[in-house]
Amino acid sequence: MPDKSTIEKAKKDKAEGKSASTQAGEFVHDEIEKIRKGKHGARSPQQAIAIGLSEARRAGVDLPAPKTGGEALKKKAAQDEKRGKSNKPVSAKRSRARVEALKKEPTNTVSSGALSKQAKKAAKKRSVTDRSKAAKKAATTKGPTQRSAAAKKAARTRARKK
């Protein structure tokens, strides 16, 4: 079950006109923090992300099912979306069983190294034009000071790679 503060952050993001994936990012971040604190574990970084996205859909974030992916994934996303629209409370027994199962999983799967590896792997799957388009879109949402800081950081990275 997501924290009230996470739901509030997601609502704030929605009010600011941010995308559904940004709103869902709050839930993913919350899930990673829970695992790092040792409340429970995850088998892989992908599982931690999937749990966060599922919680986001169940909390009412209008996050569509992914275009790519298997039938089971799309079915689960649709199920979560439907759950987000209903007001039926979560069964305590089911919720407890979920946490108990996750407690048996490792917590080192969301270390900074593991998440960095996951992010790089995910980025490699995207085309250069797609990544470039996303970067340009991100730049437009930043203010001038943030843009300047990002440009300086990019310049430092380029200099380091030479």
Segments predicted by a language model, with ranges:
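A charge-rich, low-complexity, intrinsically flexible signal that marks solvent-exposed coils, linkers
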Residues: 1-162
